[in-house]
Amino acid sequence: MLLMVLALSVVLAGCGGDGSSRPPASAATIAAPAPPPPAELCGGPTTKAQSFWLSAPGGAQLSAAVVGTGPTTAVFVHEAGPRGLCGFWPYADWLAKTKGVRSVLFSQCGTGASQCPAGNATDQWLAATTAAVTWARDHGARQVTLVGASVGGIVALQVATSIRPRVDGVVNLSGERRWMGVDSLAAARRLQVPALFAVAPGDSYVSVGTMRQLYRAVPVRTKRLVVAEGAGHGWELLGGAAGSDWSPLAVTVAAWIQGRHR
């Protein structure tokens, strides 16, 4: 009789009749593995960086990485094209090793391993950039500078005008006047943070005159326009693609990120 009672107890326990037992985790509830780190994804510097999925509005999951430590942080907004976060990776590595700057890099919707629902590209880029700044602040950043190249420069200007609390500075490397309904001149007129603009005279996408117009439109006193040598565009102006021979502009941008606005 005792054996029968014990057997019945085991059966009832296995049934979970009180509804308190939890089903095994399904594949959908198991966290996805982190995206490849920049050293693997991009090549170039082999510095270890933390890769992660950056959540953005609408259910977007963006391939992202952070390198370096400390409260002084740069959030990089890449150019259009397939390179995504890789375009700024060598520079971010240099900042971490030589300037004590932490960098947040991410690939926008439609680039790299980032996964996004269908939607307006402009809205997605702006929302993703805002999410990256928020992530940086949530993870210890006390001083945040947005740095954008080409289209990323346009996006960086726009986000710098709208995000609250404000970022501590913004850098526009060859960002054109307009992109898919976003007007850089209108954004420049609303800026209330230190702003650095850079352009090369041989740039076929944006002229020195256009960049000077954006610079002059910024109402704050703390601003600077750098006309670099040659014909580079966007992150090309920084030089040092192989991790060396960084341009004078690269040093200027690093100082801007560190809060030395001159």
Say what each PLM segment does.
Residues 81-93, 108:
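The serine-hydrolase catalytic nucleophile loop
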Residues 30-67:
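N-terminal cap/lid segment of alpha/beta-hydrolase-fold proteins
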Residues 148-156:
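Gly/Ala-rich beta-loop-alpha elbow adjacent to hydrolase catalytic centers
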Residues 119-139:
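Alpha/beta-hydrolase active-site loop
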Residues 96-115:
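Conserved alpha/beta-hydrolase
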Residues 70-71, 78-83:
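Active-site glycine-rich loops that stabilize anionic/oxyanionic intermediates
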Residues 191, 197-199:
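Short beta-strand/loop motif that positions the catalytic acidic residue
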Residues 184, 206-216:
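Short alpha-helix in the alpha/beta-hydrolase fold that links the catalytic acid
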